[in-house]
């Protein structure tokens, strides 16, 4: 299936149902009281994270999701049916952004996590709600409010423990093939990898970690050159970055300059990403003898000002790969994910209908004070309609 990590969708919540104006009519009861029911609330739109999905390709074709409208109230104090909710399933790791405000509404990082993205409209009130000691036959009702409407930008960010960095043809895909069951395409030309891929590295029956391979970076990637800039976001959730350096590039380029380009592109893209733990890994040491490889790696590290440990491996022959993987596993165990305590935001804001509609009446009263000719009555024959507003 084609990998798609960005999509734009429109979500529209259902409108609230209108209240009903009705009066009780039964035999021998010629003047029954009001019995108009309230409308139903509009349906909400939810996003739900699903670990069985790994792409947003479905939302390249289906772009609009609308919840059901609440039904109108009916006579005999019958409340309208609430509109049905709509649930949109997205892959785990999806970030949700409101295009209108640029606000990040949430990150879907756990299977089954739900996020409300459009709130349904509030129900309107039937005339029963307006009955009082001074207005026995109210003919007022309120209309349901419109539901939320939003354009959402969905961005899929892979959830991996380890991210692979490097120039094209540095051996990233060969490495992930060597340590996991993932089989990304490997060839002797640049940009063989066109989309990110994940591999699970199993050290034993109980220990494992996930590694992400993204297309190689080139100079100017932060400004849009090459393919890597589109996929750098997939490294934002990694705990450690493995910077693979081709110790003896076949094109004759300088490994030191190649490494500096990668570091520079990281810093241009995001300070947060550039500050992540990064390990230096020299690949393709099978192309020379051990002493020469060690001397060359040491010289490159010194030129980069690298004072920490570095690794010498050959992904093709798997020299040094096992040691590197165990060190990564140890680092992951010793540095568990620290989840920042997010502000406790209620998934659903609760409003009492009387608070909401009381505000409407207060606004109506304020307008009436400014305009003597203003009349809030929906029925011109109801002379007591306005009296309710002033004597509620």
Curated annotation (Swiss-Prot):
Feature: compositional bias, Polar residues: 129-143
Localization per record: Cytoplasm
Keyword Transferase attributed: no
Keyword Magnesium: yes
The protein's Enzyme Commission number: 3.6.5.-
Gene expressing this chain: obg
Protein name per its UniProtKB record: GTPase Obg
Record-annotated OBG-type G domain positions: 160-333
Cofactor field: Mg(2+)
CDD domains recorded: Obg
Chain segments annotated as coiled-coil in the UniProt record: none
Domain of life: Bacteria
Protein role: An essential GTPase which binds GTP, GDP and possibly (p)ppGpp with moderate affinity, with high nucleotide exchange rates and a fairly low GTP hydrolysis rate. Plays a role in control of the cell cycle, stress response, ribosome biogenesis and in those bacteria that undergo differentiation, in morphogenesis control.
Species whose genome carries this gene: Klebsiella pneumoniae subsp. pneumoniae (strain ATCC 700721 / MGH 78578)
């Amino acid at each position: 299936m084609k990998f798609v990590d960005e999509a734009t969708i429109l979500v529209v919540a259902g409108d609230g149902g209108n209240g009903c104006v009705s009066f009780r009519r039964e035999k021998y009861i010629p003047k029954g009281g009001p019995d108009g029911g309230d409308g139903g609330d509009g349906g909400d739109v939810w996003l739900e994270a699903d670990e069985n999905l790994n792409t947003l390709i479905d939302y390249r074709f289906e772009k609009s999701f609308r919840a059901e409208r609440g039904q109108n109230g009916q006579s005999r104090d019958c409340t309208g049916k609430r509109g049905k909710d709509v649930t949109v399933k997205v892959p785990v790791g999806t970030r949700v952004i409101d295009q209108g405000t640029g606000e990040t509404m949430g990150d879907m990082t756990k299977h089954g996590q739900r996020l409300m993205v459009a709130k349904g409209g509030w129900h309107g009130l039937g005339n029963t709600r307006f009955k009082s000691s001074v207005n026995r036959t109210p003919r007022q009702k309120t209309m349901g409010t419109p539901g939320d409407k939003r354009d959402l930008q969905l961005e899929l960010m892979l959830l991996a423990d380890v991210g692979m960095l490097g120039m094209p043809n540095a051996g990233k895909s060969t490495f992930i093939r060597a340590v996991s069951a993932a089989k990304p395409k490997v060839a002797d030309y640049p940009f063989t990898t066109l989309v990110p891929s994940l591999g699970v590295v199993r050290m034993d029956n109980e220990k494992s970690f996930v590694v992400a391979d993204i297309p190689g970076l080139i100079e100017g990637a932060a400004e849009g050159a090459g393919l890597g800039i589109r996929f750098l976001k997939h490294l934002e959730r990694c705990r450690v970055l493995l910077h693979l350096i081709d110790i003896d590039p076949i094109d004759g380029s300088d490994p030191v300059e190649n490494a500096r380009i990668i570091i520079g592109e990281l810093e241009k893209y995001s300070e947060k990403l550039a500050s992540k733990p990064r390990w230096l890994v020299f690949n393709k040491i099978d192309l020379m003898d051990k002493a020469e490889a060690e001397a060359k790696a040491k010289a490159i590290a010194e030129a980069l000002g690298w004072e920490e440990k570095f690794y010498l491996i050959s992904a093709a022959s798997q020299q040094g790969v096992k040691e590197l993987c165990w060190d990564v596993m140890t680092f992951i165990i010793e540095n568990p994910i620290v989840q920042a305590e997010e502000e406790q935001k209620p998934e659903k804001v609760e409003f009492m209908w009387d608070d909401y509609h009381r505000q409407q009446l207060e606004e109506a009263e304020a307008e009436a004070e400014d305009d003597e000719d203003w009349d809030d009555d929906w029925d011109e024959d109801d002379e007591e309609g306005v009296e309710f507003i002033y004597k509620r």
